[in-house]
Amino acid sequence: MVKAVVGANWGDEGKGKITDMLAEQADIIVRFQGGANAGHTIVNNYGKFALHTLPSGVFYEHTTSVIGNGVALNIPILFDEIKSITDRNVPMPKIVVSDRAQILMPYHIDFDAYEEERLGGKAFGSTKSGIAPFYSDKYAKIGFQVSELFDEELLKEKVVRVAEQKNVLLEHLYHKPLINPDELLETLHQYRDMVAPYVCDVSLFLSEALKEGKTVLLEGQLGTLKDPDHGIYPMVTSSSTLAAYGAIGAGVAPYEIKQIITVCKAYSSAVGAGAFVSEIFGDEADELRRRGGDGGEFGATTGRPRRMGWFDCVASKYGCRLQGTTDVAFTVLDVLGYLDEIPVCVGYEIDGEVTTDFPVTAKLEKAKPVLKTLPGWKCDIRGIKNYEELPENCRKYVEFIEEQIGFPITMVSNGPGRNDIIYRESSLKK
């Protein structure tokens, strides 16, 4: 059986914690898209970790962690990450890397920074992790696939060709130092030696595992609103963030994905530029940011303060629909316990008309939030294990959100730890 854990919104929803929790019952956890541009924060018995490439189930000795073909593989970061967890007494994880994954090169990171510098005030707010240049090269067919590291003749020829192409841009557009082909080849040789013991045919590995009845967990990065097709284009990432892409980025049949757990935050947050209708500012935002997450709302990759907002029912309903949601995991509910009243965005006013349907970006830029205010519960809900033991206003908040988005909230997270979770029955669960 294959399950997917994905985000409904802009990322930062708490997918790492949910994956870490569900991984206890899984055999294999797969990263299927994205790169080291977004971090998943996990709090468990070993401590607090921010993972960028490793799957969040890496802390269980019984699991195999897979880097799928859809990932932008930064090989040094992968191995730095492995060392960072084993240095803190986490057992050495079982790692498998797809021979069809492509390699994020140092020059991708350089080009990312150069382009943001060139764009100036019109920049996209990139994490400067090299993601857009990487995927640009992948689809221009000038990327380096892991399998190519083991074909020396092909590698030498390709290094010269790629360096020539890149150097035209470096010299004439960015006016930056050129790439030395010999140094580039040496870098690729180092990468080959690092990754060689872990490389395999991942799609075949997963196919055999599913025949044996094993459970596979697909871990998504970011969320629906960062998808290049269905998100707030162009302020999006460069690989699909949808569960449907899990079949492609991991190499499994689409019909194998039986459960799609979409993670929603009890309020909204975002990193980077782009339309954010329910955004709040000033002291109100600062207080929510300070209390939020598991130690403040700051990007796990960039450390940038996240933009804050109230829960957005319009965006979340859309995000859940596009993901094909079977279950919603509703996270960081405990954070809202300080508020007397909690506004919720239930619609968008665009050119004088109210809609509950998520629009394209040009219309989204004009949208103003239509807010409904719900009563707060004014207490700490951490430690509660049963849904019925939550304060009445807290339950009403969850049930109101569920009604608005139209998808079953079956998990409620009320703390940062692996076991801070409440399971609930939903009338929407078929």
Question: Which residue stretches match the model-derived regions?
Answer:
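Non-transmembrane, aqueous-exposed alpha-helical and coiled segments at domain scale
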Residues: 1-430
